[in-house]
């Protein structure tokens, strides 16, 4: 059985709710959900260019967990872009992770 999720500290503000290809209604496309902690990992690791150790400390998680989140987020973003799918971003209420 998996361990319960540890409380994560999130600070990134999500600018919109989704990204999708132009000209195709989103109801006709496959949706991929990017979780709030994955979004935060992308922000800290790829935008702010923090080391995994520093970013993990800011989120209150282990470096290994941060690495898993970052890899998962990158895969979801790459899949959405290359396969023409909808990437759903976390809502503001998703930031209240426990």
Swiss-Prot record:
Question: Which Gene3D superfamilies would you find in this protein's record?
Answer: Winged helix-like DNA-binding domain superfamily/Winged helix DNA-binding domain (1.10.10.10)
Here the disulfide bonds are none
UniProt-listed Pfam families: DUF134
- Taxonomically, which superkingdom? Bacteria
Q: Which family does it belong to?
A: Belongs to the UPF0251 family.
HAMAP family in UniProt: UPF0251
Protein name, per record? UPF0251 protein Sputw3181_3483
Source organism per entry reads Shewanella sp. (strain W3-18-1)
